[in-house]
């Protein structure tokens, strides 16, 4: 669900868990105008989207590196729409971005994407976990 609401409106809607992010990239299948946002040039990016069939799309792009220049908001819109997103939004894309995949055969998480930082990895208070509840181990360090 995309939208701006007060805490009380969210509770009245039955929302139990929520994240705040932006700018919106795609809403109801239409590309959004993202002009006026800071950091609009090439930067590390993270985005989340959802297709009409309910599937989630999560994208990470490193940047400010010789091997990866980063992406613009317009790049994110194009990628998300190419993969069928009907709704998508930008998340924080700096060194707080990690994409981790758990091994199919053992409980051994592997880092797929880690956006570089001069200061090393950041501790994060919030993460997005995708999978069946009985298969998600939240005890990673």
Q: Which residue stretches match the model-derived regions?
A:
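Gly/Ser/Thr/Pro-rich low-complexity, intrinsically disordered segments
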Residues: 1-141
């Amino acid at each position: 669900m995309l939208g701006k609401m007060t805490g009380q409106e969210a509770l009245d809607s039955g929302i139990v868990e929520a994240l705040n992010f932006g700018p919106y990239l795609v809403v109801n299948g239409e590309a959004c105008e993202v002009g006026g946002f800071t950091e609009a040039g090439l930067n590390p990016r993270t985005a989340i989207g959802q297709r009409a069939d309910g599937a989630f799309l999560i994208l990470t792009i490193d940047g400010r590196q010789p091997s990866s220049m980063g992406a613009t908001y317009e790049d994110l819109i194009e990628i998300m729409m190419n993969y069928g997103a009907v709704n998508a939004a930008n998340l924080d894309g700096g060194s707080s971005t990690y994409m981790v995949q758990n091994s199919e055969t053992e409980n051994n998480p592997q880092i797929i994407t880690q956006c570089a930082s001069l200061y090393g990895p950041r501790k994060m208070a919030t993460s997005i976990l995708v999978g069946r509840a009985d298969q998600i181990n939240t005890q990673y360090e």
